[in-house]
């Protein structure tokens, strides 16, 4: 009688361990998503830098919050929180392609960080310009990618 319960318990334990253990494919998938995010952020930065609208140059001086320390995937919560205000600032100045790019960035960030929202961002006292903000998140992606290789 107890033997069946013990076998069931062992089977359940093995199933839990197998499903929660990180696999190389999930690591590879995370790397690919980070590379995609990095590329999209670079394209957004390029779109911002190459825009000739004189009003946009004023908007580029607006400051955006950066987390005190962005070193883990959970810190993407901070990027997600700042993307909406960034999109609102840029929406009238950038092409439809850039707006789609912002949407892609949002989707990739959600995929990387998951639906977990319990993490609360601690923002630095100093804010960043839009260009600095994008550059720091591009660097963040590269840093995480390098730890996964």
Swiss-Prot record:
Disulfide bonds join 78-121. One of its GO terms (biological process) is adaptive immune response. GO terms for molecular function: cytokine activity; growth factor activity; interleukin-2 receptor binding. InterPro entries: 4_helix_cytokine-like_core (IPR009079), IL-2 (IPR000779), IL-2_CS (IPR030477). The keyword Disulfide bond applies. Belongs to the IL-2 family. This is Interleukin-2. It comes from Equus caballus. The lineage of its organism: Eukaryota, Metazoa, Chordata, Craniata, Vertebrata. The gene is IL2.
């Amino acid at each position: 009688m107890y033997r069946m319960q013990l076998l069931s318990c062992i089977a359940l334990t093995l199933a839990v361990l197998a499903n929660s253990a990180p696999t190389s494919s999930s690591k590879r998938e995370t790397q690919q998503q980070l590379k995609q995010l990095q590329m999209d952020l670079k394209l957004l930065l390029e779109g911002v830098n190459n825009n000739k609208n004189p009003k946009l140059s004023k908007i580029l001086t607006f400051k955006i919050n950066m987390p005190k320390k962005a070193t883990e995937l959970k810190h993407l919560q901070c990027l997600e929180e700042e993307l909406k205000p960034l999109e609102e600032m840029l929406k009238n100045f950038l092409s439809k392609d850039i707006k789609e790019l912002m949407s892609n960035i949002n989707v990739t960030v959600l995929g990387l960080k998951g639906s977990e929202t319990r993490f609360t961002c601690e923002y630095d006292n100093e804010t960043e310009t839009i260009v600095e903000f994008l550059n720091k998140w591009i660097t963040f992606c590269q840093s995480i990618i390098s730890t996964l290789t």
